[in-house]
Amino acid sequence: VTIGRFRVRRLMRELGLVSKQPGSHAYKQATVERPDIPNRLNREFATEHPNQVWCGDITYVWAQGRWHYLAAVLDLHTRRVIGWAFSAKPDAELVIKALDMAYEQRGKPQQVLFHSDQGSQYASRLFRQRLWRYRMQQSMSRRGNCWDNSPMERLFRSLKSEWVPSTGYLTAQEAQRDISHYLMHRYNWIRQHQFNDGLPPAVAEEKLNPLSGMG
């Protein structure tokens, strides 16, 4: 008998059962402000067209008995997920892979403003070189101010509260498949988004800009 995760959640709540949760995660945040990368976005989250501003961030997911890391890239125009990467290491290569995916799938646009927090991955020489190669401008949140990148915070909150099992995943491969399905299918094409007056991000983008975006 196959039982979906949402039914399991409801049954456990009715029976007063609590699942075993993974241990707390200690994620090293930036401790030094980076004045050389200003907050160019400055919470101007409304854009005029796709590929004007992209946002990126990293979160963590329990899989295969340890923490793994998810980097995602969001196009602010309709809050569409356009790139992601998953790895056991929260290094610069992780965020570069997510950026590469977004860049290729969006048709290699130029003059994009890329915004993130002050994580060391986004301030790394490797990542900044990739932005330079793609002719993108960089923007960073002020230190310790999550509201400067709130669209990414909301994306990850939705992923974890609506989709990721509370006990994590048995394997990293299962986590990648499941998270990919949520981000690129459910979140982009099915889930209603308040920012788009109830339209899913990909649907809103196609309606507003039928010749732009990803397939």
Located regions from the model:
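Charged DNA-binding/catalytic regions of mobile-element recombinases
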Residues: 1-215
